[in-house]
Design a protein with these regions (language model features):
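Extracytoplasmic c-type cytochrome modules immediately beyond a signal peptide or single-pass transmembrane anchor
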Residues: 18-118, 133-142
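The canonical Cys-X-X-Cys-His
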Residues: 117-129
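C-terminal motif of bacterial Sec signal peptides marking the signal peptidase cleavage site
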Residues: 13-14
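Sec-dependent signal peptide recognition
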Residues: 1-7
Length: 142
């Protein structure tokens, strides 16, 4: 009987100790979580990717391509992502990108022109923002 009482006492005490440890680990975070807000440039890049993915499909199907969307010109003045800088390198690459992008619409060899535009994207992203390079490479028309 004494052994039974000792066992119950030990179990009771050990259960109480775990409760206090659990309570200390369940504290609420003191910092408020902030949702990511994409910059104008990040949103523009996403729109251009979507458009070029659709353009890629049109080229493959030999459909009419339409014309260069005007919003592509916003690459020259869209607000950059925090920590990124609009410098001469970026401005030169942006100008070259717009040139290669616009050439697609009047080209006799749209596949080659399109792939040149993809090269232009990658050449800038290698220096400025490497994250989306693998995604951009998927635009190539083989």
């Amino acid at each position: 009987m004494k052994n039974l009482l000792v066992i119950f006492s030990v179990l009771f005490l050990s259960c109480n100790q775990n409760k206090s440890e659990e309570n200390s680990t369940c504290e609420k975070p003191t910092e408020e979580l902030k949702m990511y807000e994409a910059s104008e440039m990040a949103v523009l890049m996403e729109q251009m990717y979507v458009h070029n993915n659709q353009l890629r499909e049109k080229i493959i199907k030999k459909d009419s391509l339409g014309k260069l969307p005007k919003y592509f010109l916003n690459i020259s003045d869209a607000t950059m992502t925090k920590g990124k800088e609009r410098d001469d390198f970026f401005n030169n690459k942006a100008g070259f990108f717009l040139k290669t992008q616009s050439e697609i619409y009047g080209s006799k060899n749209t596949k080659e022109s399109f792939n040149t535009m993809v090269d232009a994207c990658i050449s800038c992203h290698k220096v400025k923002c490497g994250g989306p390079i693998e995604r951009i490479k998927k635009l190539y028309i083989k």
